């Protein structure tokens, strides 16, 4: 069983290619998708100006207000349905959020630390973003008895506050892959792999991935850190590869990109 995650830029620029590639996967799979660019576009059309914040580590992320959460749910649900409708002729596929069967549980971030426009640290309300606390592998295993492909939007469920939460798509993919002890986790990005001095690093051990995460830019550093931890927790390999090429999943399974084992 494999877990595949495609980031928002990949979804925006190569959704049809991703769908075609998913149709050719010959084993059971779980697909986690992003869609941040589409959320931003839709928010602006609705007159809601998106807000982004920067963490002390330099990571820029969406600030999810209650109003923005509603747009996020709407857009992510649309993307999920587009994927399902174009694959249903060939595969038994279902779209899900973490609220379905309480499959992915998260806790709302009550407070977050940001760097303001003056470069100072500030503590602000966390909005409707969450940190994943639990993946119910039994629920997901039962679903895989009936379906070939599960499509997850990056929305987890907070049972305490009875709400869906925006969660990091990478975090969701890593959490699901770890809980399911997946053979392979594929991260499809807008680059060919982990780049150092303009060249793709082909292979890394889990230890090397965690070490390199301290010396590489925001975004990829978290992927490498989580990849190292995921390998140590039972996933056989993590592949970071381009989602913009033809048949990107097959391309990744041919170990083109960066392979962490």
From Swiss-Prot:
EC nos: 2.7.2.17, 2.7.2.19
UniProt GO MF annotations: acetylglutamate kinase activity; ATP binding; N2-acetyl-L-aminoadipate kinase activity
Substrates-to-products reaction catalysed: [amino-group carrier protein]-C-terminal-N-(1,4-dicarboxybutan-1-yl)-L-glutamine + ATP = [amino-group carrier protein]-C-terminal-N-(1-carboxy-5-phosphooxy-5-oxopentan-1-yl)-L-glutamine + ADP; [amino-group carrier protein]-C-terminal-gamma-(L-glutamyl)-L-glutamate + ATP = [amino-group carrier protein]-C-terminal-gamma-(5-phospho-L-glutamyl)-L-glutamate + ADP
Highest taxon of source: Archaea
This protein's UniProt keywords: Amino-acid biosynthesis, Arginine biosynthesis, ATP-binding, Cytoplasm, Kinase, Lysine biosynthesis, Nucleotide-binding, Transferase
GO cellular component, one term: cytoplasm
Transmembrane portions of the chain: none
Record-listed substrate binding positions: 35-36, 62, 166
Record Pfam families: AA_kinase
Subcellular location: Cytoplasm
Family named by the database record: Belongs to the acetylglutamate kinase family. LysZ subfamily.
Name the UniProt record assigns to this protein: [LysW]-aminoadipate/[LysW]-glutamate kinase
Species of provenance: Sulfurisphaera tokodaii (strain DSM 16993 / JCM 10545 / NBRC 100140 / 7) (Sulfolobus tokodaii)
Phylogenetic classification of the source organism: Archaea, Thermoproteota, Thermoprotei, Sulfolobales, Sulfolobaceae
Encoding gene (name): lysZ
């Amino acid at each position: 069983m494999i877990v595949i995650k495609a980031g928002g830029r990949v979804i925006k620029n190569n959704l049809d290619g991703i769908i075609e590639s998913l149709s050719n996967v010959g084993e059971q799979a779980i697909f986690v998708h992003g869609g941040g660019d589409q959320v931003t576009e839709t928010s602006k059309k609705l007159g809601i100006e998106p807000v982004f914040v920067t963490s002390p580590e330099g990571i820029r992320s969406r600030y999810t207000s209650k109003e923005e959460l509603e747009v996020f749910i709407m857009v992510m649900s649309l993307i999920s349905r587009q994927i399902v409708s174009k694959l249903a002729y060939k595969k038994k596929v279902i779209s899900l959020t973490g609220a379905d069967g309480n499959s992915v549980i998260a806790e709302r971030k009550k407070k977050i630390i940001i760097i303001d426009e003056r470069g100072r640290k500030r503590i602000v309300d966390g909005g409707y973003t969450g940190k994943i606390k639990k993946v119910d592998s039994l629920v997901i295993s039962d679903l895989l008895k009936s379906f070939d492909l599960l499509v997850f939007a990056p929305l987890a469920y907070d049972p305490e506050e009875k709400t869906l939460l925006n969660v990091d798509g990478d975090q969701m993919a890593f959490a699901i892959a770890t809980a399911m002890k997946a053979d392979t986790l594929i991260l499809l990005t807008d680059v060919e792999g982990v780049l150092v001095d303009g060249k793709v690093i082909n292979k890394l051990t889990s230890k090397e991935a965690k070490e390199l995460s301290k010396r590489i830019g925001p975004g990829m550093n978290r992927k490498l850190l989580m990849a190292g931890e995921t390998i140590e927790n039972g996933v056989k390999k993590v592949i970071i590869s381009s989602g913009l090429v033809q048949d990107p999943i097959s391309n990744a399974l041919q170990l083109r990109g960066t392979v962490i084992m």
